[in-house]
Amino acid sequence: MLSSIVWTICFLGFVGFFAYQLWNRLSVLGKVPGTNRFDRIPERIKTTLVYGLGQLKFFQGEQPAGIVHAFVFWGFLVLGAQVTTMFLQGWFPDAHLPLLGVHQLGGPYMFVRDTMEVIVVACVLFLLARWIFTHPTRLMGFKPAEERLAGHPHWEAKLILTFIATIMITGMVYDGGKMVYLPDDADVQAERTWAWAANLMSIPLAAQGPDFAHAASNAAWWLHNLVVLTFLNFLPLAKHFHVITSLPNVFFSKLEPRGRLSKPVYDDTTEVFGKSL
């Protein structure tokens, strides 16, 4: 009961602050003259599927960084159901999304989820190595800028990558711990068949005993959820806000050919600069 109350306070506080930040951003955009971006809906949907969800541009740029970025993005999409479920379990311990029970579509989903978690952790390690050790030109620029930027801490990028890895790892620890301390729960044990990464995580946890696994699982649940909420609130303050806005930006993007000028509008409200004949 106490845990649910604390979780509710945390959830409302973090979500409330995020809503406040979002409102401030949207209130600024609301002052900009409107442009109709609800036209050509089929074309906008296609663009979103190809470039937003499909991440096509990242396969056309620098490699392997582009592919790695795409997998991190896809990992977040796949983890959306896991994050929602773990949030709900703060109030309803046995909650799962419709059709995502372990004996329904949840089993195959767990396999894909665990696979993406491991892939994303590997991608994060690769990206951290770029920031810390290799300093590629795309990140640091050419000399002398390269030498100057290489000396910067770049703490924001490293912090975000750490957040991402923490979300992935704590998800596996949470599920793996449950497999150890709930040996009589048929649904939890059935997850072993599908959630292969969590099952592997359960091995070292089991070696420490069920009490340790229980404590580790609970700690992982709190850390996972608090990092997600902290990440959510950090993004609007950072240059990585596009993590949230990327799909809307693609959907509402300008569809006219690059370089085409907007048609001039001449009416009584149009401001005229210079001499008008």
Where are these regions (language model features)?
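Membrane-embedded alpha-helical bundles of multi-pass integral membrane proteins
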Residues: 1-277
